[in-house]
């Protein structure tokens, strides 16, 4: 069974329960995120540039499905996310991001996930951290890790843990319950115990304290 709650003002999904289990932490569902903290780019401003107000509407559908279309403008990028809730318990997300600026630091979504889903199983490039311009040393396959083990200990805290070529991602708790995400197209992901604002405000890795949620970038 699926239960979802949306904010009428912003269009953000504030709650997603799968068979009674909450997936979204603190009402912070999927939104466009531009901020990526790199130590050499401290001058770059944080924030996603999204408008404070968006839209949220239920679209007529057939076959027992429920379709919710959300939109939100922004100075850096505008987003249209259409959620289709299927009778079999699947939530299909169709995402369109339209750049409004010449240079974006990210082109993807971020969500805060409940902290208990710390076990990570993924089909992508791995097992080590990799990026679009340096993934040749890794191989596509299915890998198991944890949110904590996706942390990379750089000399200074910064964005980390990315995996390219994502096709399937599962986040589960100690009992094996959680959420599975399948993707299409060129997609990467990271699942970390810190968000980029937290990394930017911390000078040394040993000073980092885990956030009370998991930051999922897709």
Which residues does each PLM region occupy?
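Beta-strand/loop-rich accessory regions of lumenal/periplasmic or secreted enzymes
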Residues: 2-218
């Amino acid at each position: 069974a699926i239960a979802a709650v949306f904010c009428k003002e912003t269009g953000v999904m504030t709650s997603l329960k799968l068979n009674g289990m909450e997936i979204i932490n603190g009402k912070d569902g999927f939104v466009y995120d531009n901020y990526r903290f790199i130590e050499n780019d401290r001058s770059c401003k944080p924030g996603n540039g999204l408008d404070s107000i968006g839209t949220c509407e239920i679209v007529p559908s057939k076959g027992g499905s429920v379709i919710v279309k959300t939109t939100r403008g922004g100075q850096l990028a505008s987003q249209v996310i259409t959620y289709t809730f299927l009778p079999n318990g699947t939530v299909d997300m169709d995402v369109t991001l339209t750049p409004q600026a010449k240079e974006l630091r990210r082109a993807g979504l971020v969500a805060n996930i409940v902290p208990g889903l710390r076990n990570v199983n993924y089909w992508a490039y791995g097992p080590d951290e990799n990026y679009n311009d340096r993934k040749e040393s890794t191989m596509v396959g299915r890998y198991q890790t944890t949110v904590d083990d996706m942390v990379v200990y750089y000399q200074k805290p910064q964005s980390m843990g990315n995996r390219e070529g994502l096709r399937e991602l599962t986040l589960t708790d100690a009992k094996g319950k959680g959420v599975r995400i399948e993707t299409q197209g060129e997609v990467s992901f990271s699942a970390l115990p810190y968000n980029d604002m937290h990394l930017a405000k911390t000078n040394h890795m040993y000073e980092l304290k885990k956030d009370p949620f998991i930051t999922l970038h897709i």
